[in-house]
């Protein structure tokens, strides 16, 4: 029973890293909803599993749509990028960042603790680890970092929270 209470009282209970991933970003002008819907249809047809999705729309009709996916889908993503470029679309640009990893921190204590994300970001800053993407929920925070820094990121976050 004492072990259960100790886990419950901790802010974080685990920190782990993903296999290699990449972030794919589409940036464009015009009817973003239509284009993003077409991108999602294409991803479904290609059976590409996506994660950490982010969409932004701006007042001047510009938009961006980003997601992460496994590096095993690199060839399919490159095919999609070539299709967009072959259309010579000046309204949509595709950017791909490779060689990344998601480092995720989990804990039920995160729901009631304050400054968790702040502490995670500061721990990574102390180690000079560049962060590409951050997502949070009540019980998890995920940061995307260069894969060569993923183990260092796990150690930095684990040390910060005594996991």
Predicted regions and their residues:
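A conserved regulatory-domain signal marking ACT and ACT-like small-molecule sensing domains
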Residues: 1-163
